[in-house]
Amino acid sequence: MLPPLKKGWQRTLDLRFQQAGGKTVLASAQHVGPLTVQRPFYPEEETCHLYLLHPPGGIVGGDELTISAHLAPGCHTLITMPGASKFYRSSGAQALVRQQLTLAPQATLEWLPQDAIFFPGANARLFTTFHLCAFSRLLAWDLLCLGRPVIGETFSHGTLSNRLEVWVDDEPLLVERLQLQEGELSSVAERPWVGTLLCYPATDALLDGVRDALAPLGLYAGASLTDRLLTVRFLSDDNLICQRVMRDVWQFLRPHLTGKSPVLPRIWLT
């Protein structure tokens, strides 16, 4: 059971995607509070590129964010963000973020948020769940920054719980949880950058290609393939290497998964 939360911003966003006129459209976007999206872009004609806008003031203890997205059969959506999500120091209350992404058969989701930055003293709990069907396609990443290493600031105190799940036809393929408390970072080898990338469905050939792309991260990166779910995990102390490797892996996997060449979201180039 979750602990009681101090009253803060209650923000919800529910997105519904459908096929219409030969392309994926955002059929519905219902939101409460300062959590919304920009108008969809179509740099690839039928594929919908959507920018999710987190609150500009960041996320503090007591805030609750709930994000859900449903993709109807045949949809292809790429969701990213203009900037990092920032979790600020808390006086004790917990910030809670729930993200639930549901894909119908033949739907494709590219979930590519910017990094989440946890300031020293933050108290945050995150749940991200992907519900797929056997014929859904998923390419997603999750990048956490502990402290602000670019200015020499570490996650010296605070609490972070990050839970990540992938379900296919109501069966769990991945259930993992990262739990960090009071500056104890031995479980992440004292590295400030923690990344996970997911690809479904994948093959042994894709696994081999991804492992080659992970070479710049040395011993602090690995990839595995279980029940067609390719999972990439890495740790680093260099955000530029992290971001470059993540994008390199995405660019390698995307044509195999979707049959489309990589098209960088315009916001990444600004």
UniProtKB/Swiss-Prot annotation:
The entry's keywords: Chaperone, Cytoplasm, Nickel insertion
Signal peptide residues on this chain, from the entry's feature table: none
Molecular function terms, GO-annotated: nickel cation binding
Function: Required for maturation of urease via the functional incorporation of the urease nickel metallocenter.
Highest taxon, organism lineage: Bacteria
Subunit record text: UreD, UreF and UreG form a complex that acts as a GTP-hydrolysis-dependent molecular chaperone, activating the urease apoprotein by helping to assemble the nickel containing metallocenter of UreC. The UreE protein probably delivers the nickel.
A GO term from the CC aspect: cytoplasm
Compartment(s) of residence: Cytoplasm
Protein name: Urease accessory protein UreD
UniProt key word Cytoplasm: yes
